Amino acid sequence: MLNKPEEFTKRVWKLARKIPKGRVTTYGILVGMAGGHPMMARMVTTILSKAPNHNLIPFHRIVYSSGKVWLDPKYKTERLKLYKEEGIKLDKNNKIVDFKNKLFTFE
């Protein structure tokens, strides 16, 4: 398991920055690849928001395991623009169309 919380946090930051444009990953996949327990997926947003240069982290590329995206009213317009620019289409329920082919698993 994890040696230190700081090491886990740094791994999450590093992995999040590797998600390529036009692809998404899930909170659970990100946590798993960083060596954390699945229940830690709930902490990802907080961990990422505390990263140095957190504006370099593509928050919009991290989604729920169902393919649904969270569109916070504060960032909705910006995120919808980013999805469009990256060729990621959403259905009327804010789920990624063709989610399985857009899913990035770090493999």
Model-derived regions: residue spans:
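Nucleic acid-binding interface residues in structured DNA/RNA-binding domains
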Residues: 1-107
